[in-house]
Amino acid sequence: MKFPTDRPVKVVMLGAGGTGGYVAPYVFRLLHMLDRPARFVVCDGDIVEPKNLDRQNFVPADLGENKARVLAERYSTVLGMETEYVPSFIEKLPDLMELIEPKEWELNPYSTKRAKEMVLLLGCVDNNKTRQLCHQAFHQSEELIYIDSGNGKYTGQVVCGVRRNGRT
């Protein structure tokens, strides 16, 4: 499968803790290097606690702050890239569908040609309920790239799905 290289990109990441906290800087760098419009939305309703400092990508100055906000502000400041964040858990399908709705962009200010964003949903959550929500959104989407990751103490997995033209 080949993806167009001129379409704008939108990445929506659910979860900014153990997995999301380490995935975020790489996503920021990749989007920063693209030669096309890109948006990154980080979503998490959790706050940074002392127990998170040992295994998550946070520092003591982040304690008590929302995880999504910390990551969005940290890396957008470093890379000079505007970022959105949602400081709450995404628990309802309509909310997730709204987040992954592609926006149309003008490709060139001298042309009327427009292109819809290519949307990537990153699941970096630690609960099955949200994974099921992402699965529902994936199957209801006309076009979506969905990458889900999960891990235990000694194991982990990554699953990827691609929908184009309403087909998986």
Give short role names for the model-derived ranges.
Residues 1-168:
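Adenine nucleotide-associated cytosolic modules
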